Amino acid sequence: PIEGEELEYCVNDVLGLVEAIQALMERDGDTLQTIPLTSTGYVRRNAKRAMREGIHHNFVYSILPDFETYKALREAFRGGNTHANRYYAGDIVENVHSADRSSSYPAVMCNCEFPMTEFVPILPKDLNKDYIARCITIRHKALLLRIGIKDLKLRDSFWGCPYLSKDKCRNIHKAIDTEDNGRILEAEYLETTVTDIDLKIIMEEYTGQIIFLQGWYSSYKKLPEPLINEVVKYYKDKTELKGVKGQEIFYDKAKALLNSLYGMMAQDPVKHSLIFRQFGDWDEDDTPDEELLGKSNKRAFLAYQWGVWVTAHSRDA
């Protein structure tokens, strides 16, 4: 049994947490039923409140993806474009310079445009280079495209950060990827799913014949102003603590809260629950993905495609 000083430590640890929780509940008018379970839960609640300011739930619901569009968005989603230059990997290189884009994801959430209308399927007869170009340059559309590429090859064989990742491609034929840690240098044929932003980067880096297999378009606009204001507020909280001696822990916490605004957008709306049984056994919920998406859409206050475009904009920066 726990006794003496160890028991006293455990008791005071719990009492301290109880006092902290009581202080938080008094500050925010919460009860044990309403208090967020995590620190990012506060950000989620504030973001929900912001989205209620002139943004009707029906608007968000009207632009949420159906199941087929959702699957394409999942295929297109990827994170930052981080990669080691294959010509220098493993070497010690001196007299180099570097640059860092501060708060990249919050920056694009405030400054860039996103798909703000329902995704509409592109008719098969319009899946051609001229129509896609008009959508991008004249009609100012956000595009979600399943494409194939024949005779793919880097324009510059010395380029150190090839954009296409084997993990995000399918139906790959005769590809050279082993020389660059999973990035594709060339291929006889492959298929992938991209946004219009990714398409621009691919066309800048590679040559090859692009075949448009399937696509959707949406209209570009800025994110809702109340949501942008919420991002700015958390960014201000973070920057006021940056470099302040003795505030390092609070700075890291403020930074995590700021980044969680992006995390809410990029969270997969289709999540299977794990059901724990007796004796350590567990089962995975077998509810169909389409049904889970429908349930998620009914309570969503942010659109999943916004998260997909946040990282796409950042990769293009």
Language-model features and meaning:
Residues P1-A317:
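Conserved acidic
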